[in-house]
Design a protein with these regions (language model features):
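Long, charge-dense
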Residues: 65-122, 126
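Phosphate-binding/switch region of NTP-binding enzymes
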Residues: 147-213
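Detector for small/aliphatic-rich hydrophobic stretches
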Residues: 1-66, 191, 210-213
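Structural alpha-beta junctions
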Residues: 59-63, 84, 135-139
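Short, solvent-exposed amphipathic alpha-helical segments in soluble enzyme
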Residues: 55-56, 81-82, 130-132
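Aromatic/hydrophobic pocket-lining residues that form π-stacking "cages" and hydrophobic walls in ligand
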Residues: 53, 103, 129
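A contiguous pocket-lining binding segment that forms or flanks enzyme active sites
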Residues: 107, 111-161
């Protein structure tokens, strides 16, 4: 079915996947993030992986909304390669109704959303949100920050792709400074929309100070 015919019939138009960094491309059979899907990021490098997945898309013109992620500043997003002029940070109340209303509104204007869901979120709420994500052909990246108070797990969503990212090593401090500049991360991708698990070890930018001894 052609794009024009699909539009006339009211069928969703299939758009090209959102691009990811070359080091991450082998992890995705489609070569990038398929629009309309939900990606769950877990592991100690979950947020770094989420930012890395969305960075190239922002530099290509896509807009990114980061919702409910505590202590994330613009500087950290820039370190990850995100285009600063195409990112919006939002901190809605963590009550499920206010949170879901905020995210649902942002879906209308953003191609990628990185979210840390509140613990109070229900499956009913997430089903409605994912239906909107699919209709709008955005990409929802849910980050596991459940170790923090009042934040929940990605398990409340039905994920299409599961990305597990664990730190293997830090680098930067061996040059004599206290500033960590990079982290080596093992990234494993699997899930119901992934024909077979894929795994890569990649280097991600990082901005951290080594604690004083």
């Amino acid at each position: 079915m052609t794009t024009e015919l699909r539009t006339r019939l009211g069928a969703p138009v299939v758009r090209a996947p959102l691009p990811v960094a070359p080091s991450l491309t082998p992890l995705f059979a489609e070569g990038g993030l398929v629009r309309g899907r939900t990606v769950a990021c877990t592991g100690d490098a979950a947020l770094s992986a989420a930012l890395a997945l969305s960075a190239v898309a922002t530099r290509a013109g896509s807009w990114l909304a980061v919702v409910g992620v505590p202590n994330l500043g613009i500087a950290a997003a820039i370190e990850a390669g995100v285009a600063v002029e195409r990112i919006v940070l939002a901190q809605p109340p963590r009550a499920s109704r206010e949170w879901i209303t905020t995210v649902a509104a942002l879906v209308e204007g953003f191609d990628v959303l990185i979210v840390a869901p509140p613990a109070s979120l229900s499956h009913h709420d997430t089903r409605r949100l994912q239906t909107r994500i699919l209709a709008r052909q955005s990409v929802l990246i849910v980050v596991d920050m459940s170790a923090l108070p009042s934040l929940g797990s990605p398990d409340v969503f039905v994920s299409d792709i599961d990305v597990h990212a664990d730190t293997v090593a830090w680098s930067g401090i061996e040059r004599g400074g206290s500033h960590i500049t990079q982290r080596t991360v093992n990234v494993r991708v699997e899930g119901r929309r992934c024909a077979a698990p894929r795994e890569e070890t990649v280097t991600l930018p990082c901005s951290m100070r080594q604690p004083a001894s």
